[in-house]
Amino acid sequence: MIYYIAHWDWILLQSRSEIVRSLSDKFQFVGITPLEKNRNQLTDYDEILNWKINRQRLIDIRGLIDLRNKVKNLKKTDTIHIFTLKTLILFLISTLLLKKQTYTIASITGLGYLFSKTRIAQILRIIIRPVIKRSINKNIDVLIFQNELNKEIFIEYSKFKNRIEIIEGSGLNTNKLKIKSTFNKKTKVIFVGRLLKEKGIFEYLKIAKSFSDSDDIEFYVAGDIDGGNKSSINNKELEVLKQQVMYLGNIDIPNELFKYDLLINPSHHEGFSRVLLEGAYVGLYCIANDIAGTRNIIKNLDCGFVVENNNVEKYVELIKKRQQVIDNLDSNKVRNKIIQNYSVEAISNRFKIIYNKSW
């Protein structure tokens, strides 16, 4: 049995459900996650166990105890696969004094808020580090990263010495994505993601403001506030946002992303940007902040440009020159590369090799 653990049910739905479905003929999967908005969509798992944790709290003691109780009686033949750095930290704390029973894998899909530049994050890193260094080598057999920079930073921080893998992406179901056939006469620019400061939402609004007098371009935001993340904008900031751009809320990406022309990803940090892969596959021109989790996508797929230091003026310059890039996009070539390297099938095959070695 393979146990997928995540501190948010959306994580076990997004990409991981597709992986579970792809490997269901080889393995059985149980999800351990707090059941929230996505509880009725987690149908690909053989079973879902409700992890009773309040993810809006920094440390929820009851949640740590509940996770401990769920994993302490697992069998030696079972495998645990943890998703996200936050879940890994919660797992390490909750299992501090437990005897290790299972083969345990952790996917760090991005370093997130903990490795941001905020003062609170810096303090948290200092406080949590002794716990991580003490238990990570004892309790984790394999760490999976999505880019080299995240690997280097976290290995130095944690002193992890066991097996390390680089797997770029979480698996894209390319069969669901509607393909773009033509570009709009009035260019539609879109930001897709949670409305977090760390995702670059404020930089995006500055970019949009630079085109406030232009009648040949429109700016959209698709996503929502995340109350469980300290980087999230608040309701007051959301109301201001609605006055500056066209706010869509959450959209059905597979069926709606193709309606737009240009995807902006000004995120401060990414593991391996899923929305960039989706935008590139659909056929959008993509511009992103030059970070480890976006650079390789843009470079390998040749689907747009990266911007150093999230420079708003450079974004504006590239957007103004958009037509010459759009005219030269080879979306068929992009799609073939994504299928080969970043699809659900490609990532499932990598996971399958790791799972087979755990049995």
Enumerate the predicted regions with their spans.
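A conserved mid-protein helix/loop that constitutes part of the nucleotide-sugar donor-binding site
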Residues: 13-18, 187, 191-210
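Glycosyltransferase donor-sugar binding loop
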Residues: 32-37, 192, 218-233
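Donor nucleotide-sugar binding/catalytic pocket of nucleotide-sugar-dependent glycosyltransferases
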Residues: 49-50, 133-178
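Short His-centered aromatic/hydrophobic patch
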Residues: 82-90, 108-109
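Nucleotide-activated donor-binding/catalytic signature segment of Leloir-type glycosyltransferases, i.e.
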Residues: 232-250
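Aromatic "clamp/platform" in nucleotide-sugar-dependent glycosyltransferases that forms part
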Residues: 268
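Short hydrophobic beta-strand element within catalytic cores of glycosyltransferases
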Residues: 285-288
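Conserved acidic donor-binding segment of nucleotide-sugar-dependent glycosyltransferases
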Residues: 300-313, 321-327
